[in-house]
Amino acid sequence: MGEGKKRVQFIMLDTRYDRSALVKASEPPPVMIPVVPPMPTTPILNATSNPAELKADDKAPPVPAPAPAAPKVIPPPPMPKMYVTNDDPKARVLSADQWKWLEGELKKPAELRIIVSSIQVIADDHGFEKWGNFPLERKKFLDLLNKNNIRNAVVLSGDRHLAAIAKIQLNKKTDLYDITSSALNRPSPAKELEVDQTYVGPSYLGINFGLATIDWS
């Protein structure tokens, strides 16, 4: 888009169609609630008699103890889908054809490259969908930017139900930003702001959208 010194390239990655399976984190065991044992059985005495003078046959039959209740199994509260890293060398986010296409796109001239990824590239402390679930693929992506001497790229990402801006040092001369915006109708139910070591400021949990303005001056 644009020409000359104002040429903007949009690269939109499909990070799900050919992606390997995510590895789910272990779920916590169900919570066992102990049951208070029933009181011991005691005979009911005749109220009009003196207990000291009662004979065995004068006593009312004992009240049978209630059957012990089975322990209640209360499942844990619903947890968001969380994942751990997939370190399989064959695991992938992009297919071989996608990687080849991406490298070809990065060789095209552009003053600004906006790379769109449905999942976050940089933020890696959370346990949801992200490039960090496939650390070898994430490294491959960053290495590809360095290999092609990309110094003018910005990543736009989503699927987090929050807004945040993350930054890493791509190399000694270049910082890479990942701007996350989502969602218009499904904000995060979390009560506390998400913290990530790469966030340049507080995350935002409310309904949000993002606008980008390019300053060519």
Where does each model-flagged region fall?
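Long, structured stretches of catalytic cores involved in phosphate-ester chemistry, encompassing
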Residues: 1-217
